[in-house]
C-alpha cells in the first residue's frame, strides 16, 4: 500500500485529499480543495489562488489513476462540485473529468445530514449519476475489492458532539498487510469518532485536527483535542498525520508539541516544509504589495516554487 497526500493546509489550501495505491488499484479520498473566502476579513492572496490551481491540477492528475473515489461529506474542500467556483477551482467540465467512469463510495445524501449538505448532496448526485460507473452509499458498510477492503464508519459529528455542521463518515482501507483510516473532518474532538479509530487500531491515521483558530465560536477544542488525540496515541499503534483545520492556526506547532507524540502534517510526510498560507494571509497581502514582512521559511520556499511554475 502506498499513501500519497495530495493537498492540505500545510500545502497551502483547504483540503484533506489523499491517494492510496493498492496493487494496481487506486483510491482517491475526498477529492476537493478550496480557499476560505474571508480570513482576517481579507479575501485570498494571489499566492493562495496559485496554490489552489496547483492543488486542482494534482487532484485531477490522481483522479486519472483512481478506480474508486470516496467522499466523506459534502463540503467543497472534500468534494469537487459541478459549478464554476473561483475559490473551489471547480467547473462542470472539471467535475465531469474527475468523476467519469469511477466507482463512487459516498456519504449518504439524506440520512444523518444537515440541510446545507443535503442540498449539496442532491446537486452532486443530480450531476454525477449519469457519468459514474457505480454509486454506493458508504455509511457503516464494507466493500470487498479482493486484494483490499474499504470499510466506512457510522456517521460521526463534524467536530464536537451536536455540531451544526452535520456528520461525516471515516474510511478504513485494509490490504491485509497495512491499514489506514482517513478520519476527515471529525477534528478528533468527539468521543464517537475516537472510539471507532481506537477499536480499528490502524497503522496510519490521517485526520483534520481541532479548529483551534475558531475557539471564539466552538469553545475550548484545544484541551478536548489534546485529551482525545493522546488517547489515540496511547491506545493504538497508529502513526499520525494531522493537518487541515489545526494548520489554519499559527500556533499549530505549539499544539503538536503538547501531544504525547508529535504527528506529521501532509507536507512533513512528503519531506517538505510547511506552507500554511491561510494562517499568514495578512502577511501575504503585505508581501504581495512589496512590503517587507517576516514569513516562515516553508512559505518563502513554497512561494518561490509557485513562481517557478508560472
From Swiss-Prot:
SUPFAM superfamilies noted in UniProt: Metallo-hydrolase/oxidoreductase
Disulfide bonds: none
Superkingdom to which the source organism belongs: Archaea
A Pfam family assignment: Lactamase_B_2
UniProt cross-references to InterPro entries, sorted A to Z: Metallo-B-lactamas, RibonucZ/Hydroxyglut_hydro, UPF0173_UPF0282_UlaG_hydrolase, UPF0282_hydrls
NCBIfam families with a match to the protein in the record: PRK04286.1-6
Family: Belongs to the UPF0282 family.
Protein name, UniProt field: UPF0282 protein PF0593
Originating organism: Pyrococcus furiosus (strain ATCC 43587 / DSM 3638 / JCM 8422 / Vc1)
Amino acid at each position: 500500500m502506498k499513501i500519497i497526500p495530495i493537498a492540505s493546509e500545510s500545502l497551502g489550501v483547504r483540503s484533506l485529499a489523499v491517494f492510496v495505491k493498492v496493487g494496481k488499484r487506486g483510491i482517491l479520498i475526498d477529492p476537493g480543495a478550496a480557499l476560505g473566502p474571508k480570513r482576517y476579513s481579507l479575501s485570498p492572496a494571489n499566492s493562495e489562488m496559485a496554490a489552489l490551481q496547483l492543488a486542482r491540477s494534482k487532484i485531477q492528475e490522481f483522479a486519472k489513476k483512481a478506480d474508486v473515489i470516496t467522499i466523506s461529506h459534502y463540503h467543497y474542500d472534500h468534494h469537487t462540485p459541478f459549478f464554476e467556483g473561483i475559490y473551489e477551482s471547480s467547473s462542470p467540465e472539471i467535475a465531469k473529468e474527475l468523476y467519469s467512469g469511477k466507482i463512487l463510495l459516498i456519504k449518504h445524501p439524506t440520512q444523518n445530514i444537515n440541510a446545507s449538505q443535503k442540498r449539496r448532496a442532491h446537486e452532486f448526485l443530480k450531476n454525477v449519476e449519469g457519468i459514474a460507473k457505480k454509486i454506493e452509499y458508504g455509511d457503516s458498510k464494507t466493500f470487498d475489492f479482493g486484494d483490499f477492503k474499504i470499510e466506512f464508519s457510522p456517521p460521526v459529528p463534524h467536530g464536537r458532539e451536536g455540531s451544526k455542521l452535520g456528520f461525516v463518515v471515516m474510511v478504513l482501507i485494509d490490504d491485509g498487510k497495512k491499514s489506514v483510516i482517513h478520519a476527515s473532518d471529525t477534528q478528533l474532538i468527539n468521543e464517537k469518532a475516537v472510539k471507532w479509530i481506537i477499536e480499528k487500531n490502524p497503522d496510519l491515521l490521517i485526520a483534520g485536527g481541532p479548529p483551534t483558530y475558531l475557539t471564539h465560536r466552538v469553545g475550548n477544542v484545544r484541551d478536548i483535542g489534546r485529551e482525545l488525540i493522546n488517547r489515540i496515541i496511547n491506545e493504538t499503534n497508529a502513526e499520525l498525520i494531522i493537518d487541515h483545520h489545526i494548520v489554519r492556526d499559527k500556533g499549530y506547532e505549539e499544539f503538536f508539541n503538547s501531544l504525547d507524540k508529535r504527528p506529521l502534517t501532509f507536507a512533513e510526510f512528503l519531506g517538505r516544509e510547511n506552507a500554511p498560507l491561510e494562517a499568514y494571509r495578512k502577511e501575504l497581502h503585505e508581501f504581495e504589495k512589496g512590503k517587507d514582512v517576516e514569513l516562515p521559511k516553508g512559505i518563502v520556499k513554497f512561494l518561490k516554487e509557485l513562481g517557478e511554475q508560472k
